[in-house]
């Protein structure tokens, strides 16, 4: 059973219960109540171990926050109406001495392109509204087996932002517009006043609900930037894993070449806990890519949470393009760079890294960015058919796994359905990307795709991140915000982003009397394939030295 966007008898009941309890409780009880706002997963586990709180209490507390604030931010597409029953069962297991692990009884949320059999999986597409798939994703099963309670499905950019160019982050026909809790106002500017947020949420995953403490953490997916950019926009930690680290079976795809799921959380600790559960300890036979990386002993990434993790580390600063503008070879154009305010924030981050014992290698420019040969230069590489080709190949293959229950059987049928239901809101921003992908002849376009894929791997991996890290013996590259998203996504390399500060928005002229608010900005540690353990060490040490995350204002 699922609660739809029409909210929600369950939420209203929980809200009423919460208000009643608050009004009846003596002052000393109020002080003793467990506060879920900004609470970490280990803190929740400790409270349950001590008997001061139950999983039911945690679910009720999170549902109460959703009931109080969801209308202001629109974080969820669906709520699990059986969450309290699941919590009761897990509480009974705990009472019997059966604790499954660090996620036992913890409420989490999934992006709505991750299959669940107890809630619909829509990808935000109207054609899939109410659709409950015949099987659940491997990562969903891993979470359930670990005792996690999947409390909700999050808003997302429709079909992971592969339906139309110009679609705002966290908009979908099913979910509407998600709003950034650091400024939950809508954009007042002419031409942009269609309901979209004035402060971007990133996309296509959503960090809104985790930032708001609607649940302990959530799982996003990324093809290029879709975990990192929403984490950056909502002051979250996120781990975008190596492609293959987490099974993609049962996740609505764009392309198997780059798709990956990963944790979004308020702390590095919580993200590390979640990553271990998502990965599992054995490769998934449904996803051969899961053989790429070895999991850590016992699947436990918390072993890498070292406060001294920066001691002796070598961190590279890829100045060209990512910090400073650089001329594109053979042209008079310049690419990249950042605002003075962002530059100052990154300079502060670098100073902190040095103070924590890291050696800063500056510059540590990406060789393919600096290569004078246009054939070997990342900035002149032009477009790539990899995503469009992959969408045609992999989306149709995914639809075939759904059997007769699928609302549509092919990408062509989805396009036709959307056209037939345009008046119902299926095509607010069109479907140009779907059209482009579906018109590809996979056999005729194979050679172009393979050449583009080889170029992507060479310029971003072999002649990019690999070359600079090997030559300079680096542990990681430090990028501003989610700036590493593209270059790390193409070869499928990992990144960990950590909240760090705020910057004034640039290039956003607002109507008189409407003051734009500062927007969050994090820092990212990127490495080569399967380097998550080292990146977690670095990110945790940086987080512990800074502790810059702040919860959204006015939402407590």
Label each PLM-derived region with a short phrase:
Residues 1-7:
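N-terminal secretory signal peptides that target proteins for export/translocation
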Residues 104-123, 304, 309-331, 382-461, ...:
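Short helix-loop capping/hinge segments that flank enzyme active sites or metal/cofactor-binding pockets
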Residues 59, 88, 300-306, 338-365, ...:
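Acyltransferase
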Residues 46-53, 63-71, 84, 88-96, ...:
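Sec-exported extracytoplasmic/periplasmic mature domains
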Residues 104-261, 286-292, 318-320, 324-325, ...:
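Short glycine/serine-rich loop/turn segments
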Residues 51, 105, 145, 151, ...:
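Glycine-rich, small-residue loops and helix-cap segments
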Residues 68, 149, 211-325, 331, ...:
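Structural helix-boundary/capping segments
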Residues 7-89, 95, 343-358, 412-416, ...:
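An N-terminal boundary/leader segment
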């Amino acid at each position: 059973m699922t609660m739809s966007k029409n909210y929600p008898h369950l939420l209203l009941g929980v809200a009423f219960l919460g208000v009643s309890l608050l009004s009846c409780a003596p002052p000393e009880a109020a002080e003793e109540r467990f506060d879920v706002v900004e609470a970490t997963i280990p803190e929740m586990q400790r409270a349950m171990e001590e008997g001061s709180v139950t999983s039911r209490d945690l679910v009720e507390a999170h549902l109460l926050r959703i009931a109080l604030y969801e209308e202001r931010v629109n974080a969820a597409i669906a709520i699990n109406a059986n969450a309290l029953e699941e919590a009761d069962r897990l509480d009974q297991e705990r009472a019997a001495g059966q604790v499954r692990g660090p996620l036992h009884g913890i409420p989490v949320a999934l992006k709505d392109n991750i299959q669940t059999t107890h809630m619909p999986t829509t990808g935000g597409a109207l054609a899939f509204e109410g659709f409950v798939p015949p099987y659940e994703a491997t990562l969903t099963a891993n979470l359930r087996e670990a005792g996690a309670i999947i409390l909700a499905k999050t808003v997302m950019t429709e079909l992971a932002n592969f339906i139309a160019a110009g679609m705002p982050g966290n908009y979908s026909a099913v979910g509407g517009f998600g709003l950034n809790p650091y400024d939950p106002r809508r954009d007042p500017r002419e031409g942009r006043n269609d309901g979209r947020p004035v402060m971007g949420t990133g996309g296509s995953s959503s960090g809104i609900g985790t930032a708001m403490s609607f649940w302990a953490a959530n799982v996003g997916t990324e093809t290029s930037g879709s975990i990192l950019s929403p984490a950056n926009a909502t002051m979250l930690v996120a781990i975008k894993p190596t492609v293959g680290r987490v099974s993609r079976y049962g996740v609505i795809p764009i392309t198997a070449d780059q798709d990956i799921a990963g944790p979004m959380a308020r702390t590095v600790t919580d993200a590390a806990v979640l990553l271990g559960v998502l990965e599992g300890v054995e490769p998934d036979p449904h996803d051969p890519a899961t053989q790429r990386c070895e999991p850590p002993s016992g699947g436990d990434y918390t072993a890498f949470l070292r406060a001294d993790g920066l001691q002796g580390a070598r961190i590279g600063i890829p100045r060209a393009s990512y910090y400073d503008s650089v001329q594109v070879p053979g042209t008079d154009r310049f690419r990249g760079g950042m605002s003075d305010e962002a530059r100052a924030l990154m300079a502060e981050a670098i100073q902190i890294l040095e103070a924590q014992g890291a050696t800063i290698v500056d510059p540590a420019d990406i060789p393919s960015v600096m290569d004078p040969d246009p054939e070997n230069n990342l900035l002149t590489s032009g477009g790539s058919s990899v995503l469009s080709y992959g969408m045609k190949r992999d989306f149709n293959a995914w639809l075939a796994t759904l059997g007769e229950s699928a609302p549509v059987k092919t990408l062509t049928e989805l396009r036709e359905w959307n056209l037939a239901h345009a008046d119902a809101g299926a095509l607010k921003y069109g479907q140009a990307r779907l059209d482009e992908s579906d018109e590809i002849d996979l056999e005729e376009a194979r050679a172009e795709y393979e050449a583009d894929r080889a170029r992507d791997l060479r310029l971003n991996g072999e002649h990019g991140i690999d070359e600079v890290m090997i030559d300079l013996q680096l542990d990681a590259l430090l990028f501003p915000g989610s700036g590493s998203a593209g270059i790390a996504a193409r070869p499928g390399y990992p990144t960990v982003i950590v909240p760090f500060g705020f910057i004034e928005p640039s290039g956003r002229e607002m109507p008189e009397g409407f003051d734009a608010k500062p927007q969050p900005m994090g820092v990212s540690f990127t490495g080569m394939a399967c380097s998550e353990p080292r990146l977690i060490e670095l990110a945790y040490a940086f987080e512990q030295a800074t502790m810059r995350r702040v919860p959204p204002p006015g939402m407590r």
